[in-house]
C-alpha cells in the first residue's frame, strides 16, 4: 500500500482506545473498547491517517501480564478495529515498570522516536493522542502535536492542570 499521502497519528492504548482499568488489562476478555473509539479509528483511516499505537505495559515486568496474553489482547483489538472498518498499522510497547528507569517508557520519547524511524516521518508532523500527563510530555518532548482525550485518565489529567504548554 502506498502511503506517501497518508499522515501518521499515534494513539495511546489504555484510556484512548479501550477502557482504562485499575491495575492492568491482562486478558483479551478484560480488553473492552471505549464506545465510539473503533469507529473513530476507522474514520481516521478514511481521512488518510495511518494509525500506530504506543503503550506502556508495565504488567509484563511485574509478572501480571504475559507476552502471549499481550499478543492475544492486541489480536482482539486488531480484529475489532478491522470489523469497524479501520486498521492499526503497528503497536509499540514498553514492558517496563516506572521504577525500571528504562528509556522506552513514556514519558521518555524513545518509543515515539522509534515509531518515527520505522515509518520515516517527522514527529513535528505527527498528532499524538493520549490520556495521561506522561503521554503529553512524551509527545511534547519530540515536537508531536499532543491531544488529551477526556476518557480513561484524561479527565483527571486535565483537572490536575499540569499540561505542557502548546
Residue ranges of predicted features:
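Active-site neighborhood of HAD-like aspartate-dependent phosphohydrolases
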Residues: 1-52
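Short, well-ordered beta-to-alpha junction loops that form the rim of enzyme active sites
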Residues: 14, 56-57, 131
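Flexible, glycine- and charge-enriched loops at secondary-structure boundaries
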Residues: 27-34, 66-71, 105
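Substrate-recognition element of Asp-dependent hydrolases with the DxDx(T/V) motif
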Residues: 37, 41-74, 87-100, 139
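Generic anion/oxyanion-binding catalytic loop in active/binding sites
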Residues: 26-29, 59, 101, 128
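Generic beta-structure capping elements
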Residues: 14, 20, 94-96, 152
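Asp-based, Mg2+/Mn2+-dependent phosphohydrolase catalytic module
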Residues: 2-5, 9, 68, 72-89, ...
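Short acidic, glycine/proline-rich loop/turn micro-motifs
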Residues: 21-25, 63-64, 158-161
